[in-house]
A protein has these predicted regions:
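Terminal, low-structured helical/coil segments at or just beyond the last alpha-helical repeat
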Residues: 208-242
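Short coil turns that delineate tetratricopeptide repeat
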Residues: 71-74, 108, 142, 185-186, ...
Length: 242
């Protein structure tokens, strides 16, 4: 007769393995959640297993079971984020953003939802809102350990922050963000961001320098950037009146 403890040990190993996979992906929002309720954590792991396999309906059902056990803000923020993740995996972008916003309002230190909210606001030309989200995402990234910190994402976030600050005419802050971006791997087309910033600051020499950088690294953006920076420098661009 088989020893039933073998099955128990296998299940426990699978559970620990699943937790570690999800912790690596979502650690800053997952680890503080449901610390005092291991049964709910098991339910959450199960929900995340389904969500990761794009079995969104089952994942959402399990999240609904978890909801009554959300006691602390850490529980509520994680729950709202994972509801947003369900909608994201299901292709429902508006609902995804709505729930990521709710998670942010409760408060958490996971960069990813803030970055997604920043990019959505940026694409909608809501530059002030995007700036705030980029700054929060950067703060969360900087709080991570050196081993976990993603330098490519940090460089991209700082470059996009530069763009938003430029569009709301906060040029000293934009230049500081641009200088911070230079500490990380260069982003494709980043010279376009710098060219626009320096054109807005009236620095034709630095604008030309970054357009030359574009010619070498990202020629597809040269014509559009030259046109925009030319308008900015001449005072004819509507977003940058003299």
């Amino acid at each position: 007769m088989e020893n039933p403890s073998i099955d128990f040990e296998s299940a426990e190993f699978a559970l620990r393995q699943s937790w570690e996979i999800h912790r690596q992906a979502f650690g800053p929002i997952l680890e503080p959640a449901f610390v005092e309720n291991q049964q709910v954590r098991i339910l959450l792991i199960n929900a995340l297993n389904h969500i990761s396999r794009r079995e969104v309906k089952r994942g959402m059902e399990l999240l609904k079971e978890i909801h009554p056990h959300c006691i602390y803000d850490e529980d509520k923020a994680a729950w709202a984020f994972f509801v947003g993740l369900c909608f994201e995996m299901g292709g429902a972008r508006d609902q995804m953003l709505e729930w990521y916003e709710k998670a942010g309002e409760i408060g958490h230190r996971f960069y990813l939802p803030y970055l997604k909210l920043a990019k959505a606001a940026h694409a909608a030309a809501q530059f002030e809102k995007a700036k705030d989200y980029y700054q929060t995402a950067i703060e969360c990234l900087q709080e991570m350990s050196e081993n976990d910190k993603d330098e490519i994402i940090l460089g991209s976030a700082y470059t996009n922050l530069t763009s938003c600050l430029t569009m709301i005419h906060q040029y000293p802050e934009a230049e500081n963000a641009w200088k911070a971006a230079q500490q990380y791997p260069a982003q494709p087309g980043a010279d376009a961001t710098a060219a626009i910033l320096y054109a807005a600051m009236g620095n034709a020499e630095k604008t030309a320098e970054h357009i030359n950088g574009l010619k070498e690294k990202f020629p597809a953006w040269v014509e559009q950037t030259q046109q925009m920076t030319g308008q900015i420098l001449s005072g004819t661009h509507p977003a940058f009146p003299k």
